[in-house]
Amino acid sequence: GWSGSYWTMSKYIRQAYIFMDNVKALPKQNVTESDVETMKNECRFMVAYYYWMMTLAYGAVPYFEDDMTSDSPDLMRGQKSFEWMIDWLDNQFLELSKVLPDSWSTLYGGRATKLAALALRARILLFAASPLVNGNEWYLGFKNSDGEERFSQAYDANKWKKAADACKQLIDEAEKKGKGLY
């Protein structure tokens, strides 16, 4: 079943990295290189989604760009700041929107698509622009292991512009695909 705990999310991220490291084309089973690339992009989508869930719940989180084993010296790393995670998520979902398919047949419903990546990106940027984390002094003094602030206390009006642009991009792309607001 579903569990949104930190440990479950980390496990899901690791499983996606293991899959990406090991998936191969299998011509005899009709699994092509194109299929493999699609599966890897879907894993990247899920990794970014799980990092978003952790960032939403915890703010600053440890970030790993590949599989970590329990004996890795890098396993006990510090947290990346909330702003760093938001920038990374923004870039991931924007890149994924360029390589994921526009849609899937109903047989494959629920899989990652271009519009899903753009929608998550817009939602993430809206949250990052909100007063909860944009200039909120409640987080003053919350530092990571490197002594960096976990959250910026400086209000940045440009975050709203970036969020609005992401929402506009999503709406425009959705309308191109026949999925308008009304």
Regions found by a protein language model. Give the residues of each.
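An aromatic- and glycine-enriched ligand-binding surface/loop that stacks and positions planar moieties
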Residues: 1, 40, 59-61, 86, ...
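Short linear capping/connector segments at secondary-structure termini
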Residues: 66-73
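Hydrophobic side chains in beta-strands
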Residues: 50, 65, 124-126
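Short beta-alpha connecting loops at secondary-structure transitions
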Residues: 73-77, 148-151
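Short, hydrophobic secondary-structure boundary micro-motifs
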Residues: 63-66, 105
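Conserved, well-structured interaction surfaces
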Residues: 1-58, 74-109
